[in-house]
Amino acid sequence: YSVRNNLTEITYSNIVDAYEKITIGLPSSVENRGDDVIELVAYHEAGHTLLALLFSEFFDVKRVTINANKGGAGGYTLFTTKEKYQSLPTKKYLLANLIVALGGRAAEVVLYENYQSSIPSNYDNSEVFYNITDLDITTGASADLQQANSIARQYVAQFGFDMIGLYDSSSSSKPFLGRDMAMGGDKMSDDTKKIIDCKVTELVEYAYNTAYEII
């Protein structure tokens, strides 16, 4: 980027641009999205940004955009973890990271709650979807949900940050007879996995509810 712009030195902006290109993709040269989609993307990224700024002790927000790119992203929030927490993540850092990851979904819910309450409709479909909430939420947060579940599973099963104790599920890939006997065989292992799954679900729900309340 510095050579392309005829610069004599590499600037911080050049580094950020190169990092974006590698991790996120090239910006799209065509904008054919409707205003409603752009508004949704703006809310989504604002959710991530607001929470990342709230947890400024852990994160530095580098760039926020609602411009689409060729990698398929409608927009993105680029932030980095401060050096201290890159090498030694704390329990609080992981929880903050989890909340930030779900900020986009929480912001979408807030947007459509406001949208639905402000626009009357002559069509009542409540009987069709009577037991389903947040019907206008999009699939745009799918990558965020994957990230959140990954963080939550590490929190519970790898780092021992939950009530189940200092159990590392990764050790299950290296079985030995003494451990199998101590854990009660396959039945105990299955029970432990169920406990981990429940704890992960609880943690993700906690993070989402916290993100929603803040936004």
Label the predicted regions:
Residues P27-S29, V37-Y43, T49-I215:
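Soluble catalytic regions of large protease machineries
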Residues Y1-R4, V16:
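C-terminal helical "lid" of AAA+/P-loop NTPase domains
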